[in-house]
Regions:
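Positively charged, solvent-exposed patches that mediate nucleic-acid binding
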Residues: 1-132
Length: 132
């Protein structure tokens, strides 16, 4: 395994208070796929928290989305400005489009890692430009 590509616990937001701190800062950006919240952490590496609500679908769908988000962050954390904590969730627009569809698994299966990666990196760059 490549050492720089790991995803240790220190790279994750783990407890509710960490999520609340990021959300309280109200620094956010969204696109058609993701909503990203950010705040400065003072650490020399970025951290991520993933929040996928039940409105996104059943457990299979939610777990697939979380795996894609974690993998996109893990592979690209070197491209993200260090010193920021991020909380990422699915865009309400995307949730509305997929909710109640019989083919929701197919829709989620069609989301590619590259789409998640591009969306995350674009939003992270918007939030961290001119900071840190």
């Amino acid at each position: 395994m490549i050492k720089g590509n790991s995803f240790p616990k220190t790279s994750r937001l783990l407890v509710n208070s960490q999520f609340r701190t990021v959300m309280a800062k109200r620094l956010s950006a969204r696109d058609e796929l993701l909503v990203l919240y950010a705040c400065e952490s003072g650490l020399d590496y970025p951290r991520i928290g993933i929040s996928i609500g039940k409105s996104c679908g059943n457990a299979v769908i939610r777990n697939r989305l979380k795996r894609l988000l974690r993998e996109a962050f893990r592979q690209n954390k070197h491209l993200v400005t260090p010193g920021f904590d991020f909380v990422v969730s699915m865009s309400p627009q995307w949730v509305r489009q997929t909710r109640g569809r019989k083919d929701a698994k197919t829709v989620v299966g069609a989301i590619k890692l590259a789409q998640i990666r591009d969306s995350f990196l674009k939003l992270a760059a918007q939030l961290t430009s001119g900071r840190a």
